[in-house]
Amino acid sequence: MQRNHSNLYAPCGLYCGVCRIYQATLENDLAYLKRLGKLYARRFPQIAALSTEELQCDGCLSARLFPSCQVCAIRDCVQAKGIEGCHACADFPCEHIDEFPIPAGKKAILRAVPYWRENGTQAWIQSEMERYHCPTCEERLYRGVKQCPVCHSIVDLD
């Protein structure tokens, strides 16, 4: 399946290309999606009853979204304002960011949006793609990871 990479430009600044849910969908790794579903069900209990197919996501701006992303105040706000993302909004950071339900995501948003605003979309994407690698072994990592699964180095990428 050919992917539309513009679907990965989440308006909030969380580049979907480094999201483990997106990567598991891309790789058709249903076992990993099931594990992620159990993890996310701790914060979003309604996810527990969903099938792995219902957990798949093709990126924030696609038609197929992870359940907790289907209702997104940030995406709705950006679309209502007719702007590309929070980086183009004079009100950033706002109550939508303050109320973001996932602490690691909120931290990444607060880091990424100013960079996106200052450097533009392509530089922001490149920066996000480069950031999420293990500094010890160069293994590809994902947002929220605290330890490299290959060399077990502790990482603080967000």
Predicted regions and their residues:
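Hydrophobic scaffolds flanking metal-cofactor catalytic centers in soluble metalloenzymes
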Residues: 1-87, 91-118
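Phosphate/adenylate-binding glycine loop and adjacent helical scaffold
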Residues: 3, 17, 136, 154-158
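Ferredoxin-like iron-sulfur electron-transfer modules
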Residues: 7, 48, 54, 122-140
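Short cysteine-rich clusters marking metal-coordination/redox-active sites
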Residues: 57, 86, 134-137, 148-151
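Short Cys/His-rich micro-motifs in 6-15 aa windows
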Residues: 77, 94, 152-158
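Broad hydrophobic/π-residue packing in well-ordered secondary structure
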Residues: 94, 123-127, 147
